[in-house]
Regions:
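P-loop (Walker A) phosphate-binding loop of NTP-binding proteins
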Residues: 19
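Hydrophobic anchor at the beta1->P-loop junction of P-loop NTPases
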Residues: 16
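Conserved glycine(s) of the Walker
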Residues: 23
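NTP-dependent small-molecule kinase module
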Residues: 2-5, 88-94, 162-171, 190, ...
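Hydrophobic positions on the alpha1 helix immediately C-terminal to the Walker A/P-loop
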Residues: 27
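Small-molecule kinase domains that catalyze NTP-dependent phosphoryl transfer to phosphate-bearing small molecules
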Residues: 78, 123-129, 139-142, 146, ...
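N-terminal phosphate/diphosphate-binding loop that engages ATP/GTP or pyrophosphate donors
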Residues: 33-101
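ATP-dependent NMP and nucleoside kinases share a basic, alpha-helical "lid"
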Residues: 94-171
Length: 244
């Protein structure tokens, strides 16, 4: 693991947003590892609540009941320090929350205003005291609007579907691949039109298009953006009255 630690005062809160399968989780985790930051994929919180709602047969039509599941969900660090393990009532359900049933239901659950509000303070607390890359769909616009650096990873829906198809080792001409493309299009529509915290790039975000990029190229672009922002922060004069 590379550990080129930046000075404490220059360690940033980085908001990394993007649509489904844009690479924000894998890219964000790799970039965070390179710069010695923590990493948090906030989408895991919504997936965990969705999995629990399915297991308990709690419908999205009952928002207060869904909101009541939040306290049972926890993110824990993995062996690399990333907040990437999902604990529900103390039991590891990391693999369960990535299943196809959750894929299908997570948009409807995530759109519940009461749930988004309930998770807001928790996500903000995770970002303290800095030195973190936080990935999601509304980090730079809602969760951390004052983040030191905002990045939005973008890619065409066809490119994102191709990646997910490859990840699952599916026939790109098969029915399952077509279903993935249709599901991503549906998720994009739901995420970008929901009433609360719709998917969009922050006005001050750096937009990185990943169409045709190698994974390593996108990671390097994010790392370079973080390093540039750290350098600018380190060069800022100390506030008047600060001790020498």
């Amino acid at each position: 693991m590379e550990d080129p630690q930046a000075p404490t005062q220059a360690r940033l809160v980085v908001a990394l947003d993007g649509p489904g399968s844009s690479g924000k989780s894998s890219v964000g985790a790799a970039a965070a590892l390179k710069v010695g930051y923590r990493f948090c994929d906030t989408g895991l919180l919504y997936r965990a609540v969705t999995w629990l709602a399915l297991a308990r047969k709690v419908s999205a039509s009952y928002p207060h009941a869904v909101r009541g599941l939040v306290d049972e969900v926890e993110l824990a660090p993995d062996e690399q320090g990333r907040l990437a393990r999902v604990l529900i009532d103390g039991v590891d359900h990391t693999e369960d929350v990535r299943g196809p049933a959750v894929d299908e239901a997570v948009s409807a659950i995530s759109a519940i205003p009461e749930l988004r509000l309930a998770l807001l303070d928790r996500q903000r607390a995770l970002a303290t005291p800095g030195g973190i890359v936080m990935a999601g769909r509304d980090i730079g616009t809602v969760v951390l609007p004052d983040a030191d650096l905002k990045i939005f990873l973008d890619a065409s829906v066809e490119e994102r579907a191709r990646r997910r198809t490859n990840e699952r080792d599916l026939d790109p001409a098969g029915a399952e691949a077509a279903a993935i493309l249709a599901a991503l299009r549906k998720r994009d529509e739901l995420d970008s039109t929901r009433a609360v915290a719709p998917l969009r790039a922050a006005t001050d975000a750096r937009i990185i298009s990943t169409d045709g990029n190698r994974f390593e190229d996108t990671v390097d672009a994010v790392v370079n953006a973080i390093r540039d922002a750290e350098a600018r922060r380190a060069a800022e004069p100390e506030p008047s009255g600060a001790s020498a």
